[in-house]
Amino acid sequence: PARGDSASWFETSVEYGLAGITRLGNSTVWLYGSSTFLTSFSTGQDLFRADTREMTRLEDLYSGIVIGSPDSDWSANFSAGRQNWQLNDGFLFSRFAAGANAGPYPALYLNPRTAYEMTALGKIKWKHLQLEGFYVDPAEIDYLDSDSTYAGANLSYTSPKGTEASLLFYQSPESNTVFPSPSGFIPREGMQTVDARLGSTALFGIQGLELFGEYAWQTHRDVDWDARAYYARAGYTFAKLPWTPNLSYRYASFSGDDPSTQTYERFDA
């Protein structure tokens, strides 16, 4: 974004509000919730603008219920509202949404706004298995809001020895977004994705040695859509060093559309 040889800017943000959790009598049921506002400020040249601007907006506004005790084999957690959410390690649904911090919004590089515009989340855990259902509306720039929503379920397994595996299905039941193609415009609404993830944080029994991979296949209920995405990541966590640093390398690939075919092949991430 620099004009000339260099550019300078300053940005800051602060989030403030109330959050709490309470137990219902002597039961194994807890109620929780949060309401916060976020004030952000920028001055100088960032990627989009060079003026001075400030913004205060609602960030979190959610409530939920947790059922279960720490010594139980099972637990459940249900919540709804504006809140931060991430699926697995964020390959497909990340807690950091670029669209919620771009354009006119201050503090672009700090990326302070992380709440989804709306969520309905449910988790049921039994021993090492967890089933998570979700319906989310990502936060987007107001005047570019595509009204896209996503609904799905993720079944995951985590072993005491560090092995992790998950199987995911989700779709977009509502969206105003369309993608251009040689055969016309392709709607996001109706897009479906199947995803599998496998990895370990203690590969070959070596604690801290990590290897993870994930593969996603995307189709559509109404049009010819065949897109793929995957990543592989290897790393090591130095647990005995201060701050437990992690050194890793990740390779990721997302398919693009081939205009010479009638099939739409661009992965929608």
Description of each model-found segment:
Residues 81:
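Glycine-rich, aromatic-flanked loop segments that form ligand/cofactor-binding clefts
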Residues 87-88:
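Hydrophobic alpha-helical segments and helix pairs
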